Amino acid sequence: MSFHSFYQRASSLFKAYPSTSKILLLSTFSGGGGVLVYSDSNPLKRILHADATLDSDGNPIRKKKVVVLGSGWSGYSFLSYLNNPNYDVQVVSPRNFFLFTPLLPSVTNGTVEARSIVEPIRGLMRKKGFEYKEAECVKIDASNKKIHCRSKEGSSLKGTTEFDMDYDILILAVGAKPNTFNTPGVEEHAYFLKEAEDALNIRHSVIDCFERASLPNLTEEERKKILHFVVVGGGPTGVEFSAELHDFLVQDVAKIYPKVQEFTKITLLEAGDHILNMFDKRITAFAEEKFQRDGIDLKTGSMVVGVTADEISTKERETGKIVSEPYGMVVWSTGIGSRPVIKDFMQQIGQGQRRVLATDEWLRVEGCDGVYALGDTATINQRRVMEDIAAIFNKADKGNTGTLKKKDFNSVVKDICQRYPQVELYLKKNKLKNIANLLKSANGEDTQVNIEKFKQALSEVDSQMKNLPATAQVASQQGKYLAKCFNKMEKCEKKPEGPLRFRGEGRHRFQPFRYRHFGSFAPLGGEQTAAELPGDWVSIGHSSQWLWYSVYASKLVSWRTRMLVISDWTRRFVFGRDSSSI
């Protein structure tokens, strides 16, 4: 190519670009000392889109904008596993760190420092090439695919603190807020245990109670009131906090505040019949017996009806009477509810009558395209087998004979189990090897079944449907699952890998989310922990405590946090807990 033809070609390309691009190119060419290389594949496009992902023709691919709300278990897990260069990822969260929430009760009494269980999110953002904004989403405009954000409360930034963001895909991972059940006085007078700030506030309050009770000129009744600690809720959080607080009283308070130790009291209130009712009955029984031996006042069947600055009132189920009791501090851990931004979003998309935001089995928000919800933010609305029973039968009955042979049924067995996880749960509960055994039990020795026998065989399967627990384990698995789906989005669009569509043609793009339970722990104090592991395996005692140490240390998200937490545990063993209020 001659210099003249090169000049004409370059000139025409130059004129085709906007003025800002021309300025950039002129600045580059006029800087001197550079090398100008010509290529027939459009050199200006290569210069302007050097960092962009290009298609086979060299054209830049527009990246889909993925906005992630939240930096908790599900959000952090999603961001950690996402590896697809075709997404422009923006993260919005008022918390610029990931918090290892299972160790929050240990922060309340100084066993572990708060800084030891947080991992700054900026490191992950830098590593992945994502952008982060420290702000809170206060409004979701689903129809226009926008979110309205406000900078973190208490920010000292001057000027506007609000901004809007567009999105192509929205990931809701904002978690949940404590549920007070509209009980009067709870918001004003009780402490919660959801954030690092909550744990630190409880820690300071506990120390302040002992310092106030140590002051002179107080009556015995006043000291008893100040040192009465009430925990509302007999779930894992309430039980673990009660156990941690009892250990602090026995192991540290006796040395630090010997004159007031005799006035301390811990009361655990539970509206149900038992504490830890989601665990094996053996664990529940052991926990209740241990708390009674430890002197923790366990009251089941007690529903809190009001909290004032000085008293907590409960309604006793057996007698129906309302009893009021003075207290020094109340910790509330009775469950979770949707955040205001999620409630408003639910109204927009027709889910206003629901208690929790609903998604399908692929974590897509029902009634709103391009929005996913993870963790405590939502619950999976698992489709029932009986809703699709006729479609399943017709899909298997390829010859339209009105009956199914074993061969016909076997062709869709795998897809049924993948699409409806409750089928597998039902088989395990009834000790059946496969669905064929289920059909046999309903049809006797017949080799064929009609639609009525088919319905009869599967009629009880949906009884095994249950909501997933609001735990870190579930949230983390959901984040990882969704990230892996995004990583292979383009591949699965061409070659779907999910189960058959019983209503319609083809297959679902991905396998639906399937939760795998790896076990649960319930620390009970005194270096004893209850462990419930898959396979109906229960372990209680000191050995389970060491298993708890090893599992939690391994689940921390970085070596930095592992080293800090292990050093905190070591410090506690050697020197005791930190009782300072800073």
From Swiss-Prot:
Optimum pH is 6.8 with NADPH as substrate and 6.8-7.8 with NADH as substrate. Its EC number is 1.6.5.9. PROSITE patterns: EF_HAND_2. Residues 384-419 form the EF-hand domain. It is found in: Mitochondrion inner membrane; Peroxisome. Pfam families: NDH2_C, Pyr_redox_2. NAD(+) binds at residues 227-263. It is an enzyme of class 1 (oxidoreductase). Gene3D superfamilies: 3.50.50.100. FAD binds at residues 65-95. No effect of calcium ions on activity. Expressed in seedlings, roots, cotyledons, stems, buds and flowers and, to a lower extent, in stems and leaves. GO terms for cellular component: extrinsic component of mitochondrial inner membrane; mitochondrial intermembrane space; mitochondrion; peroxisome. Induction: Induced by chloramphenicol (Chl), erythromycin (Ery), paraquat (Par), rotenone (Rot) and salicylic acid (SA). This is External alternative NAD(P)H-ubiquinone oxidoreductase B4, mitochondrial. It comes from Arabidopsis thaliana (Mouse-ear cress).
